[in-house]
Amino acid sequence: MRLEAIRYSPGSLQILDQLQLPEHCHYETLSSVQQAREAIRAMKVRGAPAIALVGCLSLAVELQAGAGGPGLAALVAFVRDQLSLLVAARPTAVNMARAARDLTHMAAREAELEGATEETVRERVIRFAEDMLEKDLKDNRSIGDLGARHLLEQTNPRGGKVTVLTHCNTGALATAGYGTALGVIRSLHEMGRLEHTFCTETRPYNQGARLTAFELVYEKIPATLITDSMAAAAMVHQGVSAVVVGADRVVANGDTANKIGTYQLAIVAKHHGIPFYVAAPSSSCDLRLETGKEIVIEERPSQELTDLNGVRIAAQGIRVWNPAFDVTPHELITGGIITELGVFAPEELRAALSATIFSEGQTLDSPQM
């Protein structure tokens, strides 16, 4: 049975509550944008692609239930305002903001068409959200296959197996299915070319220990869990061939925001001459921002560091700094940036994506909500 973070059918949306993993697999029903926003903020669902999918599908569920209106102007305003709430839930990842921009503009255009009705605009917005789910799964398979082939060509072209280190959770639980960085690992495993996987626990929220380890065991992929502080030693002593991570936002020069701890992995990988890859869909690329210095970094509550399962583990009165993400400079991404459109060196990203996406009449400009 396929592991699913999101279960959707017209009028119905459920998410796998990732706070309860790995002990319990509990699906929670979301019937409104407000419920989706709370789930995203609480990290019951996380991962840049999954956040955008859940956000837009929650809007689709509300629209299917008759929310919005009366009148075209009121309906378009409802779509815009609900999407703005979702964008504010977790600001670092670009996927939700871009989807909100595209949906808002599309709803406004549809409403201006001759003969437009509330029903036609609703149907168009709902269909857009549903199409996102199918596209994300297709893109993930492409990322996995393209990344696996490129990694093998760079590290072991003679047909041997490779060992990969990954960080945080970038698999089926963070996407519509299959995953980005973990999708590359899945593809290597399916090809019979994966020797072993090392996944970091990913403090303070332990997405690696709770989620990635869960996925790897579920899929019977050979893997070992390590603490974040063991990564350098693993690269030296465990034969790591490459490091593959995901991304919440990749900007024009290739600088990449990803889960806190990614930056230090890239530094250590470069020191040891190990290729460092970023795997992300083009929807995670933000070409309006020139460098990573422009990325807004979300800061999380102090209790995520000071408490564990409701039990205080840090001294009372200690100060806490808890950024959820860090930015890896493009020069440390030595393997390449893996997208559904190909694998690119950071300096190639802007031209490559602009040429491909613009030829299809789309845009990768950062959303302005």
Curated annotation (Swiss-Prot):
Task: Indicate yes or no for the key word NAD.
Answer: no
One GO cellular component term noted in the UniProt record for this chain: cytoplasm
Write down which residues bear the modification named Omega-N-methylarginine: 158
Q: Which domain of life is it from?
A: Eukaryota
The pathway where this protein functions is:
Amino-acid biosynthesis; L-methionine biosynthesis via salvage pathway; L-methionine from S-methyl-5-thio-alpha-D-ribose 1-phosphate: step 1/6
Residues modified as N-acetylmethionine are: 1
Record-annotated site: Transition state stabilizer: 168
Query: Which keywords, in A-to-Z order, does the entry hold?
Result: Acetylation, Amino-acid biosynthesis, Cytoplasm, Isomerase, Methionine biosynthesis, Methylation, Nucleus, Phosphoprotein
List the active-site residues: 248 (proton donor)
For the modification Phosphoserine, which residues carry it? 366
Gene3D superfamilies recorded = translation initiation factor eif-2b, domain 1, Translation initiation factor eif-2b, domain 2
Q: Which Pfam families match?
A: IF-2B (PF01008)
Q: Among the record's GO biological process terms, what is one?
A: L-methionine salvage from methylthioadenosine
Could you tell me where this protein is found in the cell? Cytoplasm; Nucleus
Q: Which GO terms describe its molecular function?
A: identical protein binding; S-methyl-5-thioribose-1-phosphate isomerase activity
Primary localisation category: cytoplasm
Q: What is its EC number?
A: 5.3.1.23
Which InterPro entries does the UniProt record give? IF-2B-related, IF-M1Pi, IF_2B-like_C, Initiation_fac_2B_a/b/d, M1Pi_N, NagB/RpiA_transferase-like
Q: Kindly state which reaction or reactions the protein catalyses.
A: 5-(methylsulfanyl)-alpha-D-ribose 1-phosphate = 5-(methylsulfanyl)-D-ribulose 1-phosphate
Summary of the function given for this chain in its UniProt record:
Catalyzes the interconversion of methylthioribose-1-phosphate (MTR-1-P) into methylthioribulose-1-phosphate (MTRu-1-P).
Family according to the record: Belongs to the eIF-2B alpha/beta/delta subunits family. MtnA subfamily.
Q: Which HAMAP family match?
A: Salvage_MtnA (MF_01678)
- This one is known as Methylthioribose-1-phosphate isomerase
Question: Which organism is this entry from?
Answer: Rattus norvegicus
Lineage runs: Eukaryota, Metazoa, Chordata, Craniata, Vertebrata
